[in-house]
Regions:
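PLP-dependent amino-acid enzyme catalytic core
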Residues: 1-309
Length: 309
């Protein structure tokens, strides 16, 4: 059994990490549509610990697991990830002195694999054909087989995933753009969309929340879910989205090049997909302020970026 001192030590270390989570800047997205009455803004989520939006959920999951004595120094943090959450777990885990094991689809980018290895995480690869669904199943099986060994974070079912955005991302958006009209974001674990939208709806019921998903099952937007053909995350609340728009992978990739040309630095495929969705929405409405999320930059997607830019 872990000692109370050991658990308290983790809590103390957590306090030093928290200032580096969230509070990301908001960027006005210009040059991609012609409607002067519509403004698009995006949160630059790589401007925090571990370099992606997933730092928010990973930190909140770990923090609450430690406070509830579910994650102790003698247990391994276990979860399935397409990359970014795994990197966030590994980054925070390294700071806390915790061991981390990630179930990762084998087609994850080489950069993500290398980052996870450099942070000391154990990687167990699953089939590229099964995606994160297969990785989730494998993680669950491993946790059930050795419950004394692992804390299974289960980001797709863990309420602390969406709560990180309810208490963090949404509050920041309300502070930065209190008069927003639309929030639009892609669906992966669905935590970002669910948590942010839930809080925004409580703040102002007139705010429209639009979910984005790939336009068909065989897509190349890693981490995103095509809800009709995959296991829907337990934390997803279908009543929250006013609409669901579909985004094409190739069109999304075009926005990587467009963004680079306009702003001078590249972004990830999922960030470009959110911009593509926001622009699609901008062309459908007469006026309004749209807020979206740029989950990460292009640092972990070299192979994709080289083909586009």
């Amino acid at each position: 059994m872990p000692t109370l001192t050991a658990t308290n030590s983790l809590s103390t270390k957590l306090a030093t990490i928290e200032p580096h989570i969230g509070n990301t800047p908001l960027l006005r997205i210009e040059g991609f549509h012609d409607n002067e009455n519509v403004q698009i803004f995006a949160k630059l989520e790589w401007k925090q610990l571990s370099g992606s939006v997933k730092a928010r959920a990973a930190y909140n999951i770990i923090k609450n697991a430690i406070l509830e004595n579910k994650l102790t120094p003698d247990k391994i943090l276990l979860d399935a990830s397409s990359g970014n959450t795994g990197i966030a777990y590994a980054t925070i885990g390294k700071e806390l002195g915790l061991n981390v094991t990630i179930l990762l689809p084998e087609n994850a980018s080489s950069e993500r694999k290398n980052i996870l290895k450099s942070l000391g995480a154990e990687i167990i690869y699953t089939s590229k054909f099964g995606g994160t669904d297969e990785a989730q199943d494998a993680a669950k099986e491993l946790a059930e087989r050795s419950p004394e060994k692992y804390f299974y974070a289960d980001q797709y079912s863990n309420e602390n995933n969406w709560k990180a955005h309810y208490h963090g991302t949404a509050e920041e958006i309300i502070h930065e753009k209190p008069q927003l009209d639309y929030f639009i974001a892609g669906l992966g674990t669905t935590g970002t969309f669910v948590g942010t939208s839930r809080k925004l709806k409580e703040y102002n019921a007139n705010i429209q929340t639009i979910a984005l998903q790939p336009d068909f099952a065989l897509h190349a937007l890693e981490g995103w879910k095509h809800l009709e053909t995959v296991t829907v995350p337990k934390i997803y609340d279908e009543t929250i989205a006013d609409r669901i728009l579909e985004v094409n992978t190739l069109i999304s990739h075009q926005y990587i090049a467009k963004f680079y040309e306009y702003y001078g630095f590249p972004i990830s495929p999922s960030s470009a997909a959110n911009i593509a969705g926001a622009v699609q929405l901008a062309k459908q409405i007469e006026k309004g302020t749209i807020i979206t999320i740029l989950p990460d930059n292009a640092d972990k997607y070299g192979d994709v970026i080289k083909k586009i830019i």
